[in-house]
Amino acid sequence: MHIFDELKERGLIFQTTDEEALRKALEEGQVSYYTGYDPTADSLHLGHLVAILTSRRLQLAGHKPYALVGGATGLIGDPSFKDAERSLQTKDTVDGWVKSIQGQLSRFLDFENGENKAVMVNNYDWFGSISFIDFLRDIGKYFTVNYMMSKESVKKRIETGISYTEFAYQIMQGYDFFVLNQDHNVTLQIGGSDQWGNMTAGTELLRRKADKTGHVITVPLITDATGKKFGKSEGNAVWLNPEKTSPYEMYQFWMNVMDADAVRFLKIFTFLSLDEIEDIRKQFEAAPHERLAQKVLAREVVTLVHGEEAYKEALNITEQLFAGNIKNLSVKELKQGLRGVPNYQVQADENNNIVELLVSSGIVNSKRQAREDVQNGAIYVNGDRIQELDYVLSDADKLENELTVIRRGKKKYFVLTY
């Protein structure tokens, strides 16, 4: 299958410039293309993965990727469809984020092998040395204010106010495309659908300043079956950095995907063939309660982002916590699996009687409730049911001398640390 058709079949093309010309270019030989990543945090998140994996698919088809990290544009801030002005960051902060993001991209693109190995670029390399006068004379003169204000991303901000700093952002992104075309013969840009206005500013600059044709592919902004923006868990972004979102948390995110989204997400976020995904779809629809599509999705994406060992660890944590086998997990695994649950620091001189601890830690509101829970068998210490009111936690209950896991009922976990 032609790479363009495969991208379409997987639901990865939202909008393009001249589709016929782009398809022809991809058929006739190697195309150099780029995707830009502005450092707005110290990590990329799942929302970025759609463009990253689209870039990887094109590389696997023989085309040459350039990964542009916006050391300059990250200092300015993209206004596209944002309700308010971004806070400006210091150069040191942005530089640190650039390095983090460059490291993450190397997991997905091949920067080492073949004539189409990926190339990392930073737009601070050309913007850092250009003077304001040169910027206005050599770039700004090709953009009319009418053209710039016609962009939907700008229109939405006119009423609330937009600074000249952010207004000029589209010119900067347009110039990125121009520089990469002149220096590396890059003719295609890939980005999110919210970037269409900025990306076509690049094709316009290429046409007017160099009489060349540039192409654009936008990938869709992914939403779930309810229309909710994809890539957040409990309102928080799902990060690619394991220190910010653990492999276990990412695994759980994919396992909780709705049935209506699971097969579609397999096409977007995995490298399984379309035939393999069709087989999974048939099995999944025959027995949706077995959640085959979610299991495969979680396995493939966690392995892709964090590696096979991290996936196996996340799966083991899931299985042991479900079975209540707390003692089968290391403290490191428990910290990953129980991140975000209520945590209570036990003082050295504290009364370690189970009833007293349940109240002092805030697990229950009263001694009466604590006694009822214990007597009714609703309290577990490290997976073991405790029904004695006079039970006192000992050193044996301190896993690796660091923590104790309390469970109340079937699912409510609490961690005591020492």
UniProtKB/Swiss-Prot annotation:
Entry keyword Aminoacyl-tRNA synthetase: yes
Q: What positions carry the motif 'KMSKS' region?
A: 229-233
Which residues participate in ATP binding?
Answer: 232
Q: What reaction(s) does this enzyme catalyze?
A: tRNA(Tyr) + L-tyrosine + ATP = L-tyrosyl-tRNA(Tyr) + AMP + diphosphate + H(+)
User: At which positions is motif 'HIGH' region?
Assistant: 39-48
Q: Per the record, what is one GO cellular component?
A: cytosol
Q: Does the keyword Transcription regulation apply?
A: no
Q: What is its EC number?
A: 6.1.1.1
Residues forming the S4 RNA-binding domain are 352-418
GO terms, molecular function: ATP binding; RNA binding; tyrosine-tRNA ligase activity
Which SMART domains does the protein's record reference?
S4 (SM00363)
Sum up the protein's function in the record's words.
Catalyzes the attachment of tyrosine to tRNA(Tyr) in a two-step reaction: tyrosine is first activated by ATP to form Tyr-AMP and then transferred to the acceptor end of tRNA(Tyr).
Instruction: Give the protein name, as stated in the record.
Output: Tyrosine--tRNA ligase
